[in-house]
Amino acid sequence: MDLQFDICQRCHLQGTAILHQGKSFTDFKPGEHLEEIMDVYLPRFENDNSFIMASHVDRLKQSECFNNSDMTCVSCHNPHKSVQLVEKNYFDKKCMDCHNVCRDEENVSDCFVCHMPKTSSIDIPHVSISDHKIAIPNKISKVTKEKIFIGLVSINNNSPTNISRAMAYLKRYESFEKNPIYLDSAYYYLNQSPKSLAFPSFLQYYYLKKDYYSLI
């Protein structure tokens, strides 16, 4: 099941990808574990539920349906048939394979409107995507809470190395957002890594920090 899941998340899990030493983006082949090739990181925030376009895997992994069953992507999706070609109630039938009770009498035949609502992504404007975090809808809070950064999390590998974590923070800083927290976190993980592996990333760290004296 894990190997099958890795095929899907090679494309449907995008974020800050850190290749393992000696690996390239074309090295992954079906039947291999994606974590043997790369670690894919996404930021976690407290009081924030937004997500990027290609985060189907990340969102699904946060679902109770996924965590409490043997559910995979192909439990609902036929990889050889476009969702545009399936019958209208195809996905609702998939839900009803496990769930046969709906308390909302007005939407007894449209599970996805409530539990996988369409919303926008934070990285691509003017598109809508079904949120793959299958959940019971909560009442919308009128109180706006501060979004607090928790850290970068490897979605496909529960035990990434410290050098992988450090490289993820450096890449995040360089490619997405010049947040000093990323550099601080990178420095912490670099100091937890073997010096022989960390040396190139230390050079990148000092360059991004504009500490050119330390590069000499």
Feature roles, as predicted:
Residues 1-184:
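Primarily the internal scaffold of c-type cytochrome electron-transfer domains
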Residues 140-145, 209-215:
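Alpha-helical linker/edge segments of TPR/alpha-solenoid repeat scaffolds
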Residues 156-174, 193-210, 216:
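Amphipathic alpha-helical repeat scaffolds of TPR domains
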Residues 185-188, 192:
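The canonical alpha-helical register within tetratricopeptide repeats
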